[in-house]
Amino acid sequence: MPSRVNAMILAKNDTARDYLGIHPNLDLALERINDAFFATLGTERVDIIPGQCWCTKFTYDTIPDEESFFEAHEKFLDIHIMLSGSERVEVSSPKALTVFRSEPENDFWGYQGEGRVKLTLSPGEFLCVWPDDAHKIKMMVDHPETVTKAVFKIKVR
């Protein structure tokens, strides 16, 4: 098992099971990071345990950096899995950013600022961001492209 807990995870899909045991709700998602599960996803949210763990598939066009913003959560972590296309992502501590929107009832906070970690998420990879990881997603790599991604929402607090 990895020695770091509650830290951003960027890994290949075929290593997802290496992270089992960190949190029981996280295990429910990690066990489903595979092509067989992704093939069952339509456009509707799939509840694994209602209110605790679910997955939704999204298709959208990536956007310029300046049109994106950071988001963070207090109770839920996200796992972003690229199914087709690539997008740029930035991650930062919410403490290093400026909050511009607060929706506690939806476990959502929007932020502006500079990312500390910058990466490209491509098919075959997943990014797990914890409540302490503000994440800026949907950014184009070189030009706008249509991407498809699965996102797990997992209650950890």
Label each residue range with its predicted role:
Residues 43-64, 75-84, 91:
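A short glycine-rich, His/Asp/Glu-containing loop-to-beta-strand
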Residues 100-119:
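An anionic, turn-rich surface loop/hairpin at beta-sheet edges
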Residues 79, 126-128, 144-157:
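A short hydrophobic beta-strand segment most commonly corresponding to one strand
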Residues 59, 131-133, 139-141, 153-156:
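Short, structured patches in soluble enzyme cores that scaffold and shape functional sites
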Residues 112, 120-139:
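Conserved metal-binding segment of the jelly-roll/cupin
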Residues 2-56, 67-72:
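A short, N-terminal "cap"/entry segment at the start of jelly-roll beta-barrel domains
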Residues 75-77, 81-87, 95-96, 104-109:
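Glycine- and acidic-residue-biased ligand/ion/polar-headgroup-sensing regions
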Residues 71-73, 135-136:
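Histidine-centered active-site/metal-ligand motif
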